[in-house]
Swiss-Prot record:
Gene3D superfamilies the UniProt entry points to: set domain protein methyltransferase, domain 1
Protein name: Cytochrome c lysine N-methyltransferase 1
Function: Methyltransferase which mediates trimethylation of 'Lys-78' of cytochrome c (CYC1).
Span of domain SET: 18-273
EC class (word): transferase
InterPro entries on file: Ctm1, SET_dom, SET_dom_sf
Record keyword Repressor present: no
Reactions listed under catalytic activity: L-lysyl-[cytochrome c] + S-adenosyl-L-methionine = N(6)-methyl-L-lysyl-[cytochrome c] + S-adenosyl-L-homocysteine + H(+)
GO molecular function: [cytochrome c]-lysine N-methyltransferase activity; histone H3K36 methyltransferase activity; histone H3K4 methyltransferase activity; transcription coactivator activity
Length: 585
């Protein structure tokens, strides 16, 4: 890699400060590779008086994102002849046309994945077609030459125990897509290597639309030399930025970080992300940073089979179906935090999403006499009833419509999706109407349910959390029994298993000793905002329940005997609310 550094150092377009060099990283990890170092003794006095020192200036044209790749490919001067220019571009267009025709292409289309696809195309054609020199050099000497290991390298085994994590599920499906797209031109190891090399080196680089505009867009970008800078949150002494006048990428050193040590080389550290989400960093970069005082995060994803087999606090609520119908992300955000001299994992209950997660654990009404939630196993008739009210001409086909809804709902409840994209008419919330001193029931979305329940003056949040804690403790034991031994001997798998076992042991011990597990009980404010929760998983071609284990479906009964008032006191209001869904085209 020193040769790569020298190559770019000799470029007339790239500015590299004379103090900057490339050496094996000081990070205590045999696979940490190389890092950027500065020799403070080579700084000028006036530089040391500034707030920052410019270590690198990489012109936009020397970086690689979708826009710059298209610009390079569209420049005839990047090719030896007009014929080679046309030949290469025709080949790439044909390859892209075939790729875009794949039925799953758009499902996993992101800017980063498209960037990866371009480099995979370059890898398949580079021995027979001309490609711009900048692309060719970076592909051969950086992407295909670096040693890198991410979750992609062992994704098949990781998916066995962690397929319920959306990130792992998405990674596995992305690999399947790339295998189908490139199976006859790239071997599996090259596909995995290129993916890992690009995903672990991509930076989110802002770009100004034009010199007169104040608007910026962000692109997944590969930036030569800058991408050798390692992450170390607590030792961060540099950051990347852009020159808004021309969108050059800059690496800037915080001068204060070197003023105390001017005699020996110092490694340059940047922050890949302001939030240290350990699971995401492990999947993307293949490592997790050590805890050094700043909050770290982990989002636990519930095994879907565990949710489906757990009866809920009232022994009647199927948590898997509840969360699916209510579009509630079946994950628990955790935060690693130092409190009173001890570093521990806590459940981060300070987010709105956590309030939704607790909905099925809210205590029953009137000392358990009235269940908080009611599931309508014949909700296909509710759908049919509303459908026929919105479309009166459909009444003569009511039985057929009911059967269609029954089949549709059965399929959606059984598949691997984390959500059911239908109106939430399967579950009814019972709540206290304090104005009229009575109990009401209605179909409601999760956000509105949280708002309604917060209006109940006597809502027992302590009991709600207690019931959730009991459920979560059982889940921890379930996970401990599932991951007795890793299904892979890869570095990433080893770190992943060790980290989850640490979390399980820490939280189980806290629960068993009646210690605080909810972060809000600490009455402190997080020093860092956690990342957004991972997206809801979609896997509609996978059936979670085998046919022999499914409960027998109810026979379609006469609609005249179905009374919506069994499940809602606001039927007419709900008919109006969901009318758009039921209107026939």
């Amino acid at each position: 890699m020193e040769e790569v550094f020298r190559f770019y150092s000799n470029s007339r377009n790239i500015f590299i400060h004379k103090s900057l060099s490339l050496k094996p990283s000081t990070i205590d990890d045999p696979k940490s590779g190389y890092g950027l170092f500065v020799e403070p003794s080579k700084f000028k006095n006036d530089e040391l008086k500034s707030e920052t020192i410019q270590l690198l200036r990489i012109p936009k044209r020397c970086t690689f994102n979708i826009n710059t790749l298209l610009a390079l490919l569209g420049d005839e001067d990047e090719f030896s002849s007009k014929e080679e220019f046309q030949r290469t571009n025709d080949k790439i267009k044909i390859a892209l046309r075939e790729i875009m025709a794949h039925p799953n292409f758009s499902v996993f289309l992101t800017e980063t994945n498209l960037l990866i696809i371009y480099f995979m195309i370059f890898q398949t054609i580079r021995s027979r077609y001309e490609i711009p020199e900048n692309i060719q050099y970076y592909l051969e000497n950086v992407l295909m030459s670096i040693e890198v290991e991410t979750a992609m390298d062992s994704i098949e085994n990781l998916a066995t125990d962690y397929g319920h994590y959306p990130q792992i599920f998405g990674l596995r499906e992305t690999l399947n897509l790339f295998k189908e797209l490139f199976h006859d031109v790239l071997n599996l190891s090259d596909i995995k290597h290129l993916y890992s090399a690009i995903i672990s080196r991509c930076l989110e680089i802002p770009e100004r639309a034009d010199t007169k505009s104040e608007e910026f867009t962000v692109h997944s970008t590969l930036v030569p030399i800058v991408d050798f800078a390692n992450h170390e949150g607590t030792q961060k002494n540099a950051y990347f930025d852009i020159d808004p006048s021309n969108n050059d990428v800059l690496l800037l050193l915080d001068t204060k970080a070197v003023q105390s040590e001017l005699t020996k080389p110092i490694e340059v550290f940047i922050s890949y992300s302001p939030t240290e989400d350990l699971f995401s960093m492990l999947v993307t970069y293949g490592f997790t940073p050590d805890f050094r005082g700043n909050s770290q995060f982990w989002t636990v994803s519930f095994d879907r089979c565990f949710l489906r087999n757990y009866d809920g606090p009232d022994k009647t609520t199927n948590l898997r179906l509840f969360y699916k119908w209510m579009h509630i992300n079946p994950v628990v955000p955790l935060v690693k935090y130092e409190h009173n001299g001890k570093t521990r994992w806590f459940l981060n209950d300070t987010t709105p999403e956590f309030d939704m997660l607790l909905l099925p654990f809210i205590p029953s009404i009137d000392d358990g006499k009235i269940a908080r939630w009611a599931y309508d196993s014949t909700c296909h008739l509710m759908f049919t009833k509303i459908h026929c009210l919105i479309n009166p001409e459909a009444n003569e086909h009511a039985l057929m419509i009911a059967e269609n809804y029954r089949s549709l709902i059965k399929e959606k409840e059984s598949n691997g999706d984390d959500f059911i994209n239908l109106p939430p008419l399967a579950w009814s919330l019972r709540y206290k109407d304090t104005e009229n001193d009575c109990v009401r029931q209605r179909h409601i979305c999760s956000e509105d349910a949280v708002a309604v329940l917060k209006q109940e003056e006597m809502q027992d949040s302590t009991k709600t959390k207690s019931q959730f804690t009991s459920f979560f403790r059982k889940f921890l034991e379930f996970r401990r029994s599932k991951i007795i031994r890793p299904t892979s001997d890869s570095k990433v798998a080893s770190i992943l298993y060790q980290q989850e076992l640490e979390i399980i042991a820490d939280l189980a011990k806290a629960i068993d000793s009646s210690s605080t597990i909810f972060f809000s009980d600490l009455n402190v404010t997080l020093d860092t905002e956690p990342e957004r929760l991972p997206p809801l998983r979609f896997l509609d071609d996978y059936i979670e329940i085998s046919a022999d284990k499914q409960e027998p479906s109810p026979i379609c009964e006469d609609l005249s005997y179905y009374t919506p008032s069994r499940f809602t006191d606001f039927f007419q209001e709900e008919v109006s609310q969901y009318a758009a869904f039921f209107q026939d085209d």
